[in-house]
A protein has these predicted regions:
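Extracytoplasmic catalytic/substrate-binding loops of multi-pass membrane glycan-assembly enzymes
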Residues: 117-133, 137-172, 369-370
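Membrane-interface alpha helices of multi-pass inner-membrane proteins
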Residues: 63-66, 254-270, 279-281, 302, ...
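Transmembrane-helix motifs of polytopic, lipid-linked glycan transferases
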Residues: 179-200, 238, 452-456
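Transmembrane-helix signature of polytopic, membrane-embedded enzymes
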Residues: 97-99, 192-215, 467-471
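Membrane-proximal stem/loop segments at transmembrane-domain junctions that anchor or position
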Residues: 317-420
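Short acidic/glycine- and proline-prone juxtamembrane loop motifs at membrane-interface regions
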Residues: 218-232
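Membrane-interface anchor segments at the N-terminal boundary of transmembrane helices
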Residues: 60-78, 172, 176, 394-473, ...
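Loop-to-helix entry region of an early transmembrane alpha helix in multi-pass inner-membrane enzymes
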Residues: 151, 155, 159, 167-187, ...
Length: 522
């Protein structure tokens, strides 16, 4: 070929795809290797340590302590839990109707839990609910608050809640959204189970995926949290399902749906940008692998929608209220805060960005101040490598090995005003027997889950499945892990990535189940 090929005709398509396929597989393999490295570190760390979340002295804040755990008992209990889960999958894999019924019962139980507990909200959730109720009644006073002037991206979830309030004007918006969270969570189970089945196609995958969701208690408890997390997760899960479906069928409607779902997810929560970028990368890998440019075009459309839809919502509220929005806090101050010591742990929120909220702060002044503080912090890190290593170690572990992902702490600080609030208090109140048992289970389950995710990745590597759709989950995790190692850390920020990795954990569980079946046949 003398290094030259024509850019038209089947021969060009073949040679370009052959070269592109090798490149795509190599990049996917590299992503999978890095993913395995991260998950191996998290799994080992979770076995030897845990991040204990408790109520701080001022009652509202989170106190987080990294404590050493007992490795041998943890290993034994984790192994026992893995065997029980795998045995259940082997026993019930053929009974699809049973798992559908169990998921329906789980949804009903979640609705009963939020109604019976009557969980109130704290912090950002209160502000968002209040603003949505005001907007639904034509009152735009919240637009004048410093909160929305500095965090205008929260208007996306406000818009969603406002629509719900307008549809059900006489309903309690908080309780209604909690019940809706239960229904949306059932949708997440369905979407990510579909992803697991399409990616792995192994007997028992569907049962394994549903079982892990039902056994993952934080997923159940997050129905009490009125925020953009659960709705965003559903839209991201649907985007992953459509993306995977397109790679199997090349149906254009799936590609379009993938782009739209991600755009809507970005409206609800800006954290959706990480899955959006990850799927964009995977779409490029798919184009290199197959020569199909359409998925890359849909990925580009998703990026446009991720930028345009939140801006459109903000502009709509500006026009409706007549109140112009200020500039959101930029990424540079957020990066600076993420590299500082936080109130809870290294890199967690410390109110550094609050100084930049207000009309008196110009963009230039914000950038200059944040850059000076960032340079000062980087110089401190350069001069003390030991401190730097300890900082990033604490930042990583504090957000990834907190077994409840902050939702148990959130439940403990919320008032319970429902008919069965006594039972809810028994579950969440520190020192209660049920709470101690819950903490112990969450700790063991997190260890088991990380091991299953690691096993799923190892099986993918072993089978040399380096296609773009198999790189999807590893790239999402890598993106989320690296982003929150630099920017603000929170255990609740890690939670969506853990949920999105459950299809890979299902693969790990079916591996163990297959091993059990082979032993039984002997």
């Amino acid at each position: 070929m003398n290094g030259k090929t024509e850019e038209t005709g089947p021969f060009f398509m073949h040679t370009r795809t052959a070269w592109g396929g090798r490149t795509a597989r190599f990049l996917s393999a590299c992503a999978l290797a890095l993913f395995l490295l991260i998950m191996a570190g998290l799994a080992c760390s979770a076995l030897g340590m845990t991040a204990k979340a408790s109520i701080a002295m001022n009652y509202l804040n989170l106190s987080l302590d990294l404590v050493r755990d007992h490795v041998v008992p943890n290993l034994l209990l984790t192994a026992a839990l893995l065997l029980v889960l795998a045995w259940l999958v082997c026993l019930t894999a053929r009974f699809r109707w049973l798992w559908i019924a169990l998921c329906a019962a789980w949804t009903v139980a979640a609705i009963g839990f939020v109604l019976g507990g009557g969980f109130t909200q704290r912090g950002d959730s209160c502000m968002i609910i209040w603003a949505a109720e005001c907007f639904a009644s034509g009152d735009y006073l919240p637009m004048q608050s410093e909160y929305f002037q500095g965090y205008s991206y929260q208007l996306g979830i406000c818009f969603f809640l406002e629509l719900i309030k307008r549809l059900f004007p006489s309903a309690n918006l908080m309780l209604l959204m909690q019940c809706l969270n239960a229904l949306l969570s059932a949708g997440i189970i369905a979407a990510l189970t579909g992803v697991a089945v399409m990616l792995h196609r192994r007997e028992g995958t569907e049962a394994a995926s549903m079982l892990l969701f039902l056994a993952f208690v934080p997923f159940f408890l997050y129905t009490t949290y009125v925020y953009g997390t659960t709705p965003m997760l559903l839209l991201c899960a649907c985007a992953m399902l459509c993306f995977t479906g397109y790679t199997h069928t090349r149906q254009k409607r799936l590609g379009l749906a993938y782009a739209v779902f991600l755009g809507l997810a970005m409206v609800l929560k800006p954290n959706a940008l990480v899955p959006a970028i990850a799927l964009f990368i995977c779409a490029i890998l798919y184009m290199l692998e197959t020569g199909d440019r359409r998925l890359a075009a849909f990925a580009l459309l998703s990026c446009v929608l991720c930028a345009a839809l939140p801006a459109a919502v903000n502009r709509m509220y500006e026009l409706r209220s007549g109140v112009p929005l200020g500039n959101d806090i930029a990424l540079l101050p957020r990066l600076t805060m993420g590299l500082q010591d936080g109130e809870t742990a290294a890199g967690w929120y410390n109110a550094y960005t609050e100084q930049f909220i207000g009309s008196q702060v110009t963009v230039e002044a914000e950038k200059a101040q944040a850059m000076r503080d960032l340079m000062t912090r980087l110089e401190e890190m350069r001069c003390d490598p030991g401190m730097t290593l300890a900082f990033f170690r604490e930042k990583c572990l504090s957000q990834w090995i907190e077994p409840g992902y902050e939702i148990v702490w959130h439940g403990s600080i919320c008032s319970k005003e429902g008919r069965f609030n006594g039972l809810a208090n028994l579950v969440f109140r520190e020192g209660e027997t049920i709470r101690m048992l819950l903490d112990a289970y969450l700790n063991i389950f997190q260890q088991a889950l990380y091991i299953l995710i690691l096993l799923g990745g190892v099986d993918t590597m072993r089978r040399r499945e380096f296609r773009a759709e198999h790189a999807m989950i590893p790239v999402i995790l890598i993106g989320g892990f690296l982003y929150h190692m630099l920017f603000e850390a929170k255990a609740q920020y890690s939670y969506p990535y853990v949920v999105m990795m459950l299809p890979l954990a299902a693969r790990g569980l079916t591996m163990i189940g297959a091993g059990i079946r082979r032993i039984r046949k002997k």
